[in-house]
Design a protein with these regions (language model features):
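Non-catalytic positions within long, well-ordered alpha-helices that form the structural scaffold/packing
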Residues: 27-28, 87, 161, 213-214
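Hydrophobic faces of well-ordered beta-strands that scaffold small-molecule active sites
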Residues: 9-12, 36-38, 67-71, 94, ...
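Conserved radical SAM core fold
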Residues: 41-45, 73-76, 99-112, 172-177
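Glycine-rich, positively charged N-terminal anion/phosphate-binding segment
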Residues: 14-85
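Glycine-rich beta-strand-to-loop/alpha-helix junction loops that act as flexible
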Residues: 97-100, 173, 200-205, 219
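Conserved small/polar residues in nucleotide/adenosyl-binding loops
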Residues: 208-212
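Active-site-adjacent beta->alpha loops and helix N-cap segments on the catalytic face
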Residues: 47-48, 103-126, 177-189
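Alpha/beta enzyme core
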Residues: 84-93, 124-177, 185-194
Length: 219
């Protein structure tokens, strides 16, 4: 039962803030997190990780922590190529960013913008999950409820449930909410109950009483 399980806490990524220097300082000075997610890596076609991205994921910069690299892309081949590169550095779990609400990201149909293309997202996950399973790697997904309406999540969850996701990290807002408005906890509850993968909460941490009653993971 959930009440008998220890709540796990993850450090959510924040671009320009939660790089390896911050992660190491937090890990040394405060209560260690169960997982640390990197600020998103944004692969370019036929290109390796940038110096800045590589510096952030180097094992020697992340000792003693369970670190999960996060990738922001809508191109399966770019995701897979980057996952292979990360595997060479010892990583076995990768997170897909489907939550970023930034206008410059969404306009390219990445992050939360990818949620508006469910058929393309389905094909992306089919290709990525097939390749990663063969590589012995695991995929987790960070998602919102939808692009403009929480009603979109019913169809999105059907897509997610087709694949062997390690975790589904659910931010119960839509893209147009950005980080404002009240998290849609009924929708989160539906996602928690309906997901084949373990569900992790992401959003306003002031809702801890509701999170603890439903969930074992907080991001």
């Amino acid at each position: 039962m959930i009440s008998d399980m220890k709540m796990k806490y993850y450090m959510a990524p924040m671009e320009g803030l939660t790089g390896y220097i911050y992660r190491n300082a937090y890990h040394a000075c405060y209560h260690p997190m169960d997982k640390y997610f990197t600020p998103f890596l944004s692969p370019k076609a036929n290109s390796s990780l940038s110096f800045r991205e590589l510096n952030d994921i180097l094992p020697e910069h992340n000792q003693g922590m369970y670190v999960v690299p996060q990738i922001l892309t809508n191109q399966a081949e770019d995701f897979i190529r980057t996952a292979k590169e990360l595997q060479e550095y010892g990583y076995s779990e990768i997170n897909l960013n489907l939550g970023c609400p930034s206008g410059t990201v969404v306009s390219k149909y990445k992050g939360a913008g990818f949620l508006g293309l469910p058929d393309s997202l389905d094909r992306f996950l089919d290709e990525v999950c097939g390749k990663m399973e063969g590589m012995g790697m695991e995929l987790s997904v960070k998602t919102r409820l939808g692009l403009v309406s929480p009603d979109e999540f019913t169809g999105l969850l059907e897509i997610y449930n087709r694949y062997p996701l390690k975790e589904l990290i659910l931010h119960p807002r839509v893209r147009t909410d950005y980080y404002k408005n009240t998290p849609n906890m009924p929708a989160f509850g539906s996602g928690f109950d309906g997901s084949r993968a373990p569900v992790c909460y992401n959003g306003a941490v002031s809702y801890t009483h509701l999170i603890h009653s439903r969930c074992c993971y907080c991001y």
